[in-house]
Amino acid sequence: MGRTLENKKSIVAELQETLSQSQLTLVIDYKGLTVAEITDLRKRLRPTGTLCKVTKNAFMRIAVDGNQTWQPLQSFCQETSAFLLVKDDLGGAIKAYQDFQKATKKTELRGGVMEGRSLNADQVKAIGDLPSKDQLMAQIAGAINGVATKLAVGINQVPTSLARGIKAVSEKEAA
């Protein structure tokens, strides 16, 4: 027995809702993956705020139809498609997928869509090479901490230098 019209509409509505919360969508060919491997991919992606959706291409085409941001996604909807819907950590999600791809050697990245632009595999890899959100926050925190440390040392040196100067003058006068 096939899906009911209401069921199909709810699937499309769920896809539209998930897309509205996503910054980047990657399309991969998942042919040859076992259920255990797809589950492993989902586990790797979960900490980065990414969902792995395996759905019919027709549902995804309907979900993005008329939406300028995700319209280019239609060109990737062919054969066996899994959609990686990235909400937060773009670089982390791409790195997690690349690690999975190296481990299984079964999937192929078709491309992605970000801010209404279609991305090829090289462009997606370039985004993945950018530092992750956590790395950027650590770099900023380190820079702020470094400035505060230098300021504290500088403020501490002024009275110390002044005290040394006064002591030297008093010793000179006493002699």
UniProtKB/Swiss-Prot annotation:
One GO CC annotation: large ribosomal subunit
CDD domains documented for this protein = Ribosomal_L10
rRNA-binding as a keyword of this entry, yes or no, is yes
Which InterPro entries does its entry note?
Ribosomal_uL10, Ribosomal_uL10-like_sf, Ribosomal_uL10_bac, Ribosomal_uL10_bac_type, Ribosomal_uL10_CS_bac
Named from the GO MF annotations, one term is: structural constituent of ribosome
One Pfam family of this chain: Ribosomal_L10
Q: Which UniProt keywords apply?
A: Ribonucleoprotein, Ribosomal protein, RNA-binding, rRNA-binding
Write out the GO biological process terms: translation
Please list which residues make up the signal peptide. none
What role does this protein play? Answer: Forms part of the ribosomal stalk, playing a central role in the interaction of the ribosome with GTP-bound translation factors.
Q: How the protein assembles, per its UniProt entry?
A: Part of the ribosomal stalk of the 50S ribosomal subunit. The N-terminus interacts with L11 and the large rRNA to form the base of the stalk. The C-terminus forms an elongated spine to which L12 dimers bind in a sequential fashion forming a multimeric L10(L12)X complex.
Task: Cite the PANTHER family for this sequence.
Answer: 39S RIBOSOMAL PROTEIN L10, MITOCHONDRIAL (PTHR11560)
Supply the HAMAP family for this chain: Ribosomal_uL10 (MF_00362)
Q: Which family does it belong to?
A: Belongs to the universal ribosomal protein uL10 family.
Name of the protein in question:
Large ribosomal subunit protein uL10
